[in-house]
Amino acid sequence: MDVVDAHSHLFPAAWVPHGRMPADMFDVEALLARQEEAGVATSVVSDPHIWYGDLDPGTIDYAREYNNFAAELQRDHPNRVVALATATPWRGQEHIAEAERALDELGLAGIAVATSDQGQYLEAIPEAFWELVLDRDATVFLHPGGTVVGQELMDMYRLGEVCGRPLDTTVSLARLVLHGVLERLPRLRLLCAHAGGAICAIADRLDFGHELRDYAPLGPWGAVNLSEPPSAYVARLHLDTVTYGAALLRLALNRVGASQLVFGSDNPPVPFPLRRSLGYVEALDLTEGETAAVLGRNARALFHVR
């Protein structure tokens, strides 16, 4: 069965001296070897917007260098590697122009964007970025960055990683929904890392809040009145399978359906065997057609990969 891993991360080898990142994040040959061993046909490689060192993933120089690297990676390994552009569109027109270059000139397959930047969430992204994405029929891969909102309170037990990142995704997606961005842009395709954090778990609670938006004792709501319950917009999201267990994955399946679940491993950097990640999908007891969609067909459609 055709398998596409839609969630893996690599960096340029020239960046090794600038940080303390896992060695396999600089080793495409190791990625290809794991791919072959597990029967994965294609890996979608992206920037995680995480860097432990002296590089800032939000700068324009970082984006340009990464995008050039991604284009070379895709060119050197056709069919086996598909690469996404990186962009930090909150930081202005220069960054949106770089995303345009990455799609039009470099031929990258989509755009990876963090779930927040410098305390701003997804709804604060300039409209020009969404217009570019829609005009190019591109998919945006949403991945929490290394410095999420509230990071300073999560300095023990790597809580920034295990709680902070999925929380950042959850809050950012909720704001995107409630501010009406998905209602206004119904053709927007978003693939959310880690099954969208906890967005599937709180979708009904978003509906509760929206239904009681005019109930004064609970306090003020907001300016936007959606035409449908928030959960209807959550159901439009595409979610990857990086959940590290079957329970959340089943919840995601129930919320968006097999047609919007996309296999991913987060390897590298996560040093779990690809077979383990594939096992989470197998545990869902899907039909053969649904399994084929989740493991490969959905990703190929999202990123226009043959």
Indicate residue ranges for each PLM-predicted region.
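H/E-rich (His + Asp/Glu) clusters that bind or coordinate divalent metals
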Residues: 155-175, 189-306
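Hydrophobic faces of well-ordered beta-strands that scaffold small-molecule active sites
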Residues: 4-8, 43-45, 82-86, 111-113, ...
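Active-site environment of divalent metal-dependent phosphoester hydrolases
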Residues: 11-14, 51-53, 90-92, 119, ...
